[in-house]
């Protein structure tokens, strides 16, 4: 990764001034100092990304299996008639394990062999630089994945071959977020990894992007609508209810994080909208025909 702030471009006084005026400098120094050999390793990004996955899955697996009757979680559950069991999770975790063995760990090995160590900049990114870049990455992925997702549903052979794997679950939970066909996993992982290459990106911004992208992807799959959820504050953010609807009615709510494209194209729908439909419309709205889904595996 490029050193965005080469030391030779600064005088000693300028370097000290920059270090003293950058809000994120103390955070960057705390993260970096003493950990350079770990953070600079080409193995750090893939295993850091995996640690985010494992943390989300571990936390919500515990909630789903042991705290599902606690009133706070019971009230927040979106599809209250669906219970997440260990048998359901095992099927998803098994596929994730195979995907990691086939794709993630071999790619990590390739990085170890071919990718040089990361040069850790002395200076932290500015707040404006970090926030503006994260916003661009977020918008770019959300827009691009909408179309990838849309065509995966509209092109029937592509849906049957690839994306139907993710739709084995009609009631999602955190562990099902990575229940993906290897092709889809490859596309998503590659895009999340490479979108920061749009322009030179500080490694701290790069790592935070990984955290944001993966966390939002898990948040929309958790199956809970918490009172503090972002979609309750920002109308243009989809959140768990919209993606839950997508798993229940797969021809609706295609956009992964925002919803402006779904709204523009008429695919955004809520559970309240379903309740207002006539019985005839309710039975078919947003669903594939029986013929289209013939032979596809459904787990829940």
UniProtKB/Swiss-Prot annotation:
<comment type="similarity">
    <text>Belongs to the sterol desaturase family.</text>
</comment>
<keyword id="KW-0472">Membrane</keyword>
<keyword id="KW-0756">Sterol biosynthesis</keyword>
<keyword id="KW-1207">Sterol metabolism</keyword>
<keyword id="KW-0408">Iron</keyword>
<keyword id="KW-0752">Steroid biosynthesis</keyword>
<dbReference type="GO" id="GO:0000254">
    <property type="term" value="F:C-4 methylsterol oxidase activity"/>
</dbReference>
<feature type="short sequence motif" description="Histidine box-2">
    <location>
        <begin position="163"/>
        <end position="167"/>
    </location>
</feature>
<comment type="function">
    <text>Probable sterol desaturase.</text>
</comment>
<feature type="transmembrane region" description="Helical">
    <location>
        <begin position="130"/>
        <end position="152"/>
    </location>
</feature>
<feature type="domain" description="Fatty acid hydroxylase">
    <location>
        <begin position="135"/>
        <end position="266"/>
    </location>
</feature>
<keyword id="KW-0479">Metal-binding</keyword>
<dbReference type="GO" id="GO:0016126">
    <property type="term" value="P:sterol biosynthetic process"/>
</dbReference>
<dbReference type="InterPro" id="IPR006694">
    <property type="entry name" value="Fatty_acid_hydroxylase"/>
</dbReference>
<dbReference type="GO" id="GO:0005506">
    <property type="term" value="F:iron ion binding"/>
</dbReference>
<keyword id="KW-0325">Glycoprotein</keyword>
<protein>
    <recommendedName>
        <fullName>Cholesterol 25-hydroxylase-like protein</fullName>
        <ecNumber>1.14.99.-</ecNumber>
    </recommendedName>
</protein>
<dbReference type="GO" id="GO:0005789">
    <property type="term" value="C:endoplasmic reticulum membrane"/>
</dbReference>
<keyword id="KW-0444">Lipid biosynthesis</keyword>
<feature type="transmembrane region" description="Helical">
    <location>
        <begin position="180"/>
        <end position="200"/>
    </location>
</feature>
<feature type="short sequence motif" description="Histidine box-3">
    <location>
        <begin position="242"/>
        <end position="248"/>
    </location>
</feature>
<keyword id="KW-0560">Oxidoreductase</keyword>
<dbReference type="InterPro" id="IPR050307">
    <property type="entry name" value="Sterol_Desaturase_Related"/>
</dbReference>
<keyword id="KW-0753">Steroid metabolism</keyword>
<feature type="glycosylation site" description="N-linked (GlcNAc...) asparagine">
    <location>
        <position position="9"/>
    </location>
</feature>
<feature type="short sequence motif" description="Histidine box-1">
    <location>
        <begin position="148"/>
        <end position="152"/>
    </location>
</feature>
<feature type="transmembrane region" description="Helical">
    <location>
        <begin position="43"/>
        <end position="63"/>
    </location>
</feature>
<keyword id="KW-0812">Transmembrane</keyword>
<feature type="transmembrane region" description="Helical">
    <location>
        <begin position="95"/>
        <end position="115"/>
    </location>
</feature>
<dbReference type="Pfam" id="PF04116">
    <property type="entry name" value="FA_hydroxylase"/>
</dbReference>
<keyword id="KW-1133">Transmembrane helix</keyword>
<keyword id="KW-0443">Lipid metabolism</keyword>
């Amino acid at each position: 990764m490029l050193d965005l702030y080469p030391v030779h471009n600064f005088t000693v006084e300028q370097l000290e001034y920059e270090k003293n005026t950058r809000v994120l400098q103390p955070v960057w120094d705390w993260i970096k100092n003493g950990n350079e050999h770990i953070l600079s390793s080409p193995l750090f990004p893939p295993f850091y990304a995996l640690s985010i996955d494992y943390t989300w899955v571990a936390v919500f697996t515990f909630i789903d299996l042991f705290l599902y009757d606690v009133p706070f979680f019971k009230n927040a559950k979106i599809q209250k008639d669906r219970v997440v069991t260990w048998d359901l999770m095992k099927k998803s975790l098994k596929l994730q394990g195979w995907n990691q063995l086939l794709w993630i760990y071999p790619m990590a090995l390739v990085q170890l062999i071919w990718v040089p160590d990361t040069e850790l900049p002395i200076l932290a990114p500015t707040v404006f630089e970090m926030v503006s870049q994260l916003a661009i990455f977020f918008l770019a992925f959300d827009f691009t994945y909408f179309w990838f997702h849309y065509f995966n549903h509209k092109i029937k052979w592509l849906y049957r071959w690839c994306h139907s794997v993710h739709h084995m679950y009609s009631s999602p939970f955190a562990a099902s977020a990575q229940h993906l066909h290897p092709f889809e996993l490859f596309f998503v992982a590659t895009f999340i990894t490479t979108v920061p290459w749009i322009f030179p990106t500080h490694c701290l911004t790069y790592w935070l992007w990984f955290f944001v992208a993966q966390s939002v992807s898990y948040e929309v799959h958790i199956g809970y609508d918490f009172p503090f959820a972002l979609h309750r504050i920002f109308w243009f953010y989809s959140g768990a209810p919209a993606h839950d609807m997508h798993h229940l009615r797969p021809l609706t709510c295609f956009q992964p994080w925002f919803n402006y494209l779904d709204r523009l194209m008429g695919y955004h729908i809520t559970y309240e909208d379903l309740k207002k439909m006539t019985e005839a419309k309710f039975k078919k709205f947003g669903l594939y025909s029986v013929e289209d889904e013939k032979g596809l595996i459904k787990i829940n």
